[in-house]
């Protein structure tokens, strides 16, 4: 197996379209590529754009990454996202506040909760889509 690592820039996280030429060139230079791993939700949310720009159709290039969002859900629906971790951003924001309140009021220790242990794939994305589109997952 050959692994090609592309160095991203902070601008690519805020404007994923700026990565189109980099990703397209890497895929053109590696025509046997089977999977593209994205490092964040912004990039995975742009999976369809990356694939189409490089000449790939739905389900022709596996794309995986992190986070759920309306854009990532759209990529699942259209066949351009295949696996992502569900970090449950609502819980990531809510649990620290709950933990601080319990520590202050009850004197308890901090809550240690893994919110990113779940995975969303092509078989189960529909079960989280409504909550992801609402910004809760």
Please name every model-derived segment.
Residues 1-137:
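A residue-level marker of the well-folded mature domains of exported/periplasmic proteins
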């Amino acid at each position: 197996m050959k692994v090609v690592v592309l160095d991203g820039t902070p601008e690519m996280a805020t404007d994923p379209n700026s990565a189109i030429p980099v990703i397209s060139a890497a895929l053109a230079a590696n025509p046997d590529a089977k999977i593209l791993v994205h490092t964040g939700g912004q990039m995975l949310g742009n999976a369809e754009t990356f694939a189409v720009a490089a000449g790939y159709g739905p389900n022709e290039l596996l794309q995986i990454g992190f986070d759920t969002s309306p854009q990532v859900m759209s990529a699942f629906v259209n066949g351009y996202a295949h696996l992502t971790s569900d970090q449950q951003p609502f819980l990531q924001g809510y649990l620290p506040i709950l933990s601080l309140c319990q520590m202050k009021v009850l004197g308890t220790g901090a809550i240690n909760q893994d919110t990113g242990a779940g995975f969303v794939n092509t078989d189960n994305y529909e079960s989280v889509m409504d909550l992801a589109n609402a910004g809760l997952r």
